[in-house]
Amino acid sequence: MEALLNPRYPFDPSFAAGALPAYWVSPRHLAGDDGRLCDVVADSLAGLGWTSLTAVRGRRDFDELGDHHVVRSTVLHISPDALRWAQWVLADEPFHLGGLPVAWQVSARSDTTSSLADWSAYFTPGVPGEAITEFLLALDQCSQPTTLYDGPELVLATAAGNGWLRDADQPHAAAMHPTFTARLSLGEVPPLIQDADPSALTAEGDGQVAMGWQAWAEPAMGAPYLWAASFSASVPHRLVAAFAFSLSSTAPVLRRVLPESTRDQILCAPAN
């Protein structure tokens, strides 16, 4: 649930976002997505010259009120070289991460002859749009979006450089915000995370487990996640580092609405 930053305004979805007062908010990992995650990311991709395609599908549902048609639409954004793409899938009833539906799925492949992605990354609503945009900008600038140049230390060093703390028990695999409200961790990926490289599996016990980066925000211990992100095992660490840099940045972000669950944990200053 989101709430307006200005308490004088009752929460009313009919308000146009542009008519609401703007505030600078920090920390950004608790600032939410301003209710504009689709538009913010789509605008950034358009600025990079990616092509967008909209798929609209319909189905017939039956309930106690009779049958009715439900229209679902997803938007696919494709890079000029067709090696990378991003898809807004929230309306398509996707799977969940941390109890939250996936909103954006970003994928890349090594060549256009393959119909399958080499790796994918997933973001739920609530992820700061700035962090996803930074990830996509780094992806767009990669001449080889599936090549692993750097190790996982780059991700941790990036977050630590912005003041995040390494996990004392996993100093080479996890970092967290000093308030323990957000975490980056290299570990077993959740089910349904797609990755084409079988060598990315790491043997643990009697089976094989795919290891990838996970990130999430938990406003309070045991509270529902504010957002979650998952990167499959073959996502280049330098791209995750770009996401981590933006996520852990101490610079405030512009917001008009914020998550109800973090209103007591953020700092706000009028943008004007």
Give the location of each predicted region:
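Long, compositionally biased intrinsically disordered terminal regions
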Residues: 216-222, 230-272
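Intrinsically disordered, low-complexity regulatory segments enriched in Ser/Thr/Pro
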Residues: 80-133, 186-241
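Surface-exposed beta-loop interaction hotspot
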Residues: 111-172
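Surface-exposed interaction/gating patches
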Residues: 146-208
